[in-house]
Swiss-Prot record:
Protein name stated in the entry: Crossover junction endodeoxyribonuclease RuvC
UniProt remark on cofactor binding: Binds 2 Mg(2+) ion per subunit.
Record-listed E.C. numbers: 3.1.21.10
Keyword terms: Cytoplasm, DNA damage, DNA recombination, DNA repair, DNA-binding, Endonuclease, Hydrolase, Magnesium, Metal-binding, Nuclease
Active site per the UniProt annotation: 7, 73, 145
Assembly and binders: Homodimer which binds Holliday junction (HJ) DNA. The HJ becomes 2-fold symmetrical on binding to RuvC with unstacked arms; it has a different conformation from HJ DNA in complex with RuvA. In the full resolvosome a probable DNA-RuvA(4)-RuvB(12)-RuvC(2) complex forms which resolves the HJ.
GO cellular component, one term: cytoplasm
Chain sites annotated for binding Mg(2+) 1: 7, 145
Species per Swiss-Prot/TrEMBL record: Acidovorax sp. (strain JS42)
Length: 186
């Protein structure tokens, strides 16, 4: 099974792709989708343009690596409500790209991911990076956004099957995908 992990962000969205064979994990790819800067030519204020870049970037990653499922971080309510709304829009663009690619999507909180990867939910980003490096036998530390995305893929590899059986992971079925694509939600 191939899992695509997504750590959504409006400026930088991390992605990580992991193959799972039984209990063995194999690193495939990781990186980021950036929505501002020279490569995009977009300014911080161009929200619709940045969301399109994010949608297109996640769509391209899904098409290139052909995952069988995806895991996305659930956002938390920030102190700044405006930041939370912007992050929610970025997450929505990423989720829409995954659903458009007909991928089942599992969702995990940062606390769940950190607990699964490091062993406790209050782990620092550097601890997540180091454990992802060790678990996937990487030669160096991945960037923080890519490490979080790889951590989400690892979390789903270890917990997804068992959690799905007891209904703790929200997954979209193929029938639901078809209904959403057709504009129906009954």
């Amino acid at each position: 099974m191939r899992i695509l992990g997504i750590d959504p962000g409006l400026q930088t969205t991390g992605f990580g792709v992991v193959d799972v064979d039984g209990h063995r994990l194999r690193y495939v790819a990781s990186g980021t989708v950036r929505t501002t800067g020279r490569a995009t030519g977009l300014a911080l204020g161009d929200l619709p343009g940045r969301l399109k870049v994010l949608f297109d970037g996640v769509s391209e990653v899904a098409a290139r690596y052909q995952p069988s499922t995806a895991a996305v971080e659930i956002i938390f309510v920030n102190v700044n409500p405006q930041s939370t709304l912007l992050l929610g829009q970025a997450r929505g663009a990423a989720l829409t790209a995954l659903v458009n690619a007909n991928l089942p999507v599992a969702e995990y909180t940062a606390l769940q991911m950190k607990k699964a990867v490091v062993g406790h939910g209050r782990a620092a980003k550097s601890q997540v990076q180091e454990m992802v490096r060790r678990l996937l036998e990487l030669p160096g530390l991945p960037g923080t956004d890519a490490a979080d995305a790889l951590g989400l893929a690892i979390t789903h590899a270890h917990a997804g099957a068992a959690m799905a059986r007891v209904g703790e992971v929200a997954q979209l079925t193929r029938r639901q995908h078809a209904m959403y694509k057709a504009g129906r939600s009954y």
